[in-house]
């Protein structure tokens, strides 16, 4: 699937820390640039990115970088993934931490339920040819934990929370 992305739109960005917009964006972290200025990692506060963050939590994405999100002119966001997912051990590293602790929406809960239920049917059979039984069990457990919590997860503190480089 080839898609032309809109280079004028950035779903994730590094900006001056004192320039973080009050709405429409989520603050993730702050750091220093090469000149010692304080900068902030931010991402847009959009339903498309929320869905991607839920997906990343379910599949245990270990490498969601800013440039792994392609912004299309119609507002759609494509996630670029390359297989650092579905590990049985906790590996979630992402630039999409802006919703940590926020309640999941009914649509997000429904999506998690569909994945969880699908693991007992066609989705489970399909994944059985691609993942180990342990990886599928871990996927099911992540769905259950996320659904029970009803909130976006936050960093575990056990490992780096963001991939490096960020983009």
Task: Please report, for each region that a protein language model flagged, where it lies by residue.
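Phosphate/dinucleotide-binding and metal-coordinating scaffold of catalytic cores
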Residues: 1-167
